[in-house]
Amino acid sequence: MTLRLSRRAYAEMFGPTTGDRVRLADTELLIEIERDYTIYGEEVKFGGGKVIRDGMGQSQRVAADVPDTIITNAVILDHWGIVKADIAIKHGRIAAIGKAGNPDIQPGVTIAIGAATEVIAGEGLIVTAGGIDTHIHFISPQQIDEALASGVTTMLGGGTGPATGTNATTCTPGPWHMERMLQAADGWPINLGFLGKGNASLPQPLVEQIAAGAIGLKLHEDWGTTPAAIDNCLSVADDTDTQVAIHTDTLNEAGFVESTVAAFKGRTIHTYHTEGAGGGHAPDILKVCGEANVLPSSTNPTRPYTINTLDEHLDMLMVCHHLDPSIAEDLAFAESRIRRETIAAEDILHDLGALSMLSSDSQAMGRVGEVIIRTWQTAHKMKVQRGALPEDGARNDNFRAKRYVAKYTINPAITHGIAHEVGSIEPGKWADLVLWEPAFFGIKPSMILKGGMIAVAQMGDPNASIPTPQPVHYREMFATRGGALARTSLTFVSQMAADAGIAERYGLAKRIVPVRNCRNVTKADMIHNAWRPSISVDPETYDVIADGQLLTCEPASVLPMAQRYFLF
């Protein structure tokens, strides 16, 4: 017997299907479902009188043959596509994306449900991969709570707490600090990796940090990012298959941007603050976007360009970099970094895929809980100001959505050698997943899974008779407690450190995962974000020209995903 449902009725029951469109929060961005893996009339749904019951949608298969958890009828938004599917999780990893059910009685089932299977209802929800923030100043451990609740599940950077050096630079300096921070990582339900200090002109001070567990090295101008330090740091990285992140020389003391690029010698490097105001060679650090070996990112304080962006930056900069406003030279240093023209160009360079990643710069001018919000605010602003991308039509913004989600998921993972574990929703990867109601997309997740287990969720009064009564707010769940914490999150280290047995020597509880393939990555590997324009910046007007075109846009006076979501 066939029952015909309207699209509205079907979407309300099972979530949107192929050809349906979903608005992301209150933005002008619309995504359209490209494919539905489920089968009409054979959908599985949990609940009283519904499908996932013994002998119906649930089979008799034993635990070894069924997933531990399925997310039913979810919309997946990832760099590879926008699809509707059931998601299977097994042993903390994504096991399959397809059609769940009982293969004994249903056709087309690729994921068998059994008595060992838990169900998370994904109908009407969007699922994304956990975010990856690659620009963390580990100033306060409480950042992790904020980041996790925003949908970020991996944090990479450096620091030792609110030390003056950490306030300004993302470095965990030396073996002793590296060991202590790796031990501290055991206490937090998030994936972590630490960068050592890369500013030295001889190899051994850097090699010993990699051997102690650093996933890479950070060159920062506040420690002296000279051509000699750059060359030495990249040589050590090549020898150890680790990544180098760099904050270049704002004052152009040791050379101009051309000197820095020359010191790279064509070697792969992640350029932090490839942007309009965050630091680095003033005023033309944006030039490096055109280099094949440069993997550029920018940070969220300038995302997107608004009428308030310039005003808040000066005071932030003075605090973060230990500057004194009564000293003329310090004030000039700060003012040289804040340029409306290059900030405006940064918006467009993100939209065209020249800037490959977006991160926070946590508590050091950036906001750790706003990476995802500001990514999508930038996408919205560019849609409004520049219209549809050539790859998109009038019906949807699918390519733009894939481009922007890649900036904080797969591209950071590729850059830092962790894409074999995290960064996308693909079988075999660690099940770090974020579930969103479309109306709250990018702003307030409904639930965050770490390693296949619920880590954080919106939860009501624990003394209530049901889960939903007020006050509803983010609460840590069972993945953050006891021994489950260490089994649902990862600590990333160098291969050298893993081979040296630091897990046993340091007494680490979390599983350690070596980074790999950091040195073979090029801009061409940055998914949907590989454009390499020839950029020039006028030294007097700061106008940015890319491939002969002036890049400029107006500041936004109103943004979506803002005040209406944060009344309480």
UniProtKB/Swiss-Prot annotation:
Carboxylation allows a single lysine to coordinate two nickel ions. Keywords: Cytoplasm, Hydrolase, Metal-binding, Nickel. Pfam families: Amidohydro_1, Urease_alpha. One of its GO terms (molecular function) is urease activity. Pathway: Nitrogen metabolism; urea degradation; CO(2) and NH(3) from urea (urease route): step 1/1. Its main location: cytoplasm. GO terms for cellular component: cytoplasm. It is found in: Cytoplasm. Substrate binds at H220. Its cofactor is Ni cation. It catalyses: urea + 2 H2O + H(+) = hydrogencarbonate + 2 NH4(+). It is an enzyme of class 3 (hydrolase). Ni(2+) 1 binds at H135, H137, K218, D361. Ni(2+) 2 binds at K218, H247, H273. The modification N6-carboxylysine is found at K218. Residues 130-568 form the Urease domain. The active site is at H321 (proton donor). The keyword Protein transport does not apply. The keyword Ubl conjugation does not apply. SUPFAM superfamilies: Composite domain of metallo-dependent hydrolases, Metallo-dependent hydrolases. Binds 2 nickel ions per subunit. Belongs to the metallo-dependent hydrolases superfamily. Urease alpha subunit family. Heterotrimer of UreA (gamma), UreB (beta) and UreC (alpha) subunits. Three heterotrimers associate to form the active enzyme. This is Urease subunit alpha. The gene is ureC.
